[in-house]
Amino acid sequence: MSPAQVVVIGAGPGGLAAAAALGARGVQALVVDRDSQVGSSWRRHYERLHLHTPRRWSGLPGYPIPRRFGRWVARADVVAYLEEYVAHHGIQLRLG
């Protein structure tokens, strides 16, 4: 029996977390997004934006936000974290 295959629409935090959760259960997931990079909405926010919740409450399942990003994670660091999340979980992407 071959593993199930799922397409997840959106390479933002929700889509990436869904793909990681599926992968943890042995389900192959492909994340598709019309933009060319993960976390595209975060990339468009203003430069000085920080998360409004502390780092320890803001991570996605299976990979906490690293301490090096500080307690109040900046916009650029959220983007970097999402990219690390993809690599950590080996999430398959089809972007653009």
What are these regions (language model features)?
Residues 87-96:
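A conserved beta-strand/loop element that lines the FAD pocket in flavoprotein oxidoreductases
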Residues 3-31:
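N-terminal Rossmann-like FAD-binding beta1-loop-alpha1 element of flavoenzymes
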Residues 40-81:
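Glycine-rich active-site loop/strand segments that organize a redox cofactor
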Residues 23, 56, 87:
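Short polybasic/polar patches that bind polyanions
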Residues 9-12, 34, 61, 95:
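A secondary-structure boundary/capping signal
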Residues 36-38:
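Helix N-cap at the beta1-alpha1 junction of Rossmann-like dinucleotide-binding domains, i.e.
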